[in-house]
């Protein structure tokens, strides 16, 4: 019996593995993202791994309208208006491919009417039920803050310029007011390119 070379992957892929044996407790699930085409090395990459049904299933999927919704914008009653939280695995890669952090978190759809847009914002929650109760990482380099319980990946909603919100809040940062930090990132959802969103 000889070994073959296996499959050749030329695009992003997420590998999830678990060890199972009769009469033994299964291992933890191990997840790792392989990002091959990060052409913009100036931005961090956020890879989100989630069970597909938790996104797309008409009954339990949080990213879809579902079966009972108002047929006019912003589609009230759609699944994405529910306050559902689903378990995900997040990996943040700094420019150059260096892993920043990887962790299981809770994820919700975030925002107001932007929930009805194709690219939705997500909020993430570190909870002990998923593993660690906080994220020990400096999400915003130079901020001096390296411990978070939650953060947002904010889509651009109706802002087609895609950086207006972050830019405007950064203008106030030197005026002794509290503002949200802003960091654009390339996002992959289950290995699919999902656009550029802002870490907030």
Where on the chain are the PLM-derived regions?
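Short, exposed coil/turn segments at beta-strand boundaries within extracellular/luminal domains
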Residues: 23-29
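Low-complexity, Pro/Ser/Thr- and charge-rich linker/hinge segments at domain boundaries
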Residues: 33-58, 116
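Short, small-residue-biased leader/transition segments that mark boundaries at the very start
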Residues: 1-9
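C-terminal, active-site-flanking charged/polar segments
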Residues: 11, 36-40, 200
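Exposed beta-strand face motif in extracellular beta-rich ectodomains
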Residues: 11-15, 86
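Conserved ATP-binding subdomain of kinase catalytic cores across diverse folds
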Residues: 20, 48, 66-200
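Intrinsically disordered, low-complexity segments enriched in small residues
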Residues: 14, 18-19, 40
């Amino acid at each position: 019996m000889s070994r073959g070379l296996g499959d050749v992957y030329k695009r992003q892929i997420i590998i999830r593995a678990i060890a199972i044996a009769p009469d033994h407790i299964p291992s933890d699930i191990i997840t790792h993202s392989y990002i091959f085409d990060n052409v913009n090395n100036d931005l961090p990459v956020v890879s989100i791994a989630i069970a597909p049904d938790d996104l797309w299933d008409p009954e339990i999927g949080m990213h879809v309208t579902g079966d009972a919704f108002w047929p006019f914008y912003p589609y009230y009653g759609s699944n994405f208006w529910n306050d559902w939280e689903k378990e995900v695995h997040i990996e943040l890669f700094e420019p150059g491919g260096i892993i920043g952090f990887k962790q299981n978190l809770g994820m919700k759809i975030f925002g107001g009417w932007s929930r009805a847009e194709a690219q939705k914002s997500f909020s993430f929650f570190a909870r002990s039920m998923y593993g660690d109760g906080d994220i020990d990482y400096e999400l915003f380099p130079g901020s001096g803050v390296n411990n978070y319980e939650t953060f947002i990946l904010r889509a651009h909603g109706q802002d087609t310029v895609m950086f207006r919100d972050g830019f405007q809040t950064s203008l106030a940062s030197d005026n002794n007011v509290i503002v949200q930090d802003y960091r654009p990132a390339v996002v992959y959802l289950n290995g699919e390119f999902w656009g550029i969103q802002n870490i907030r």
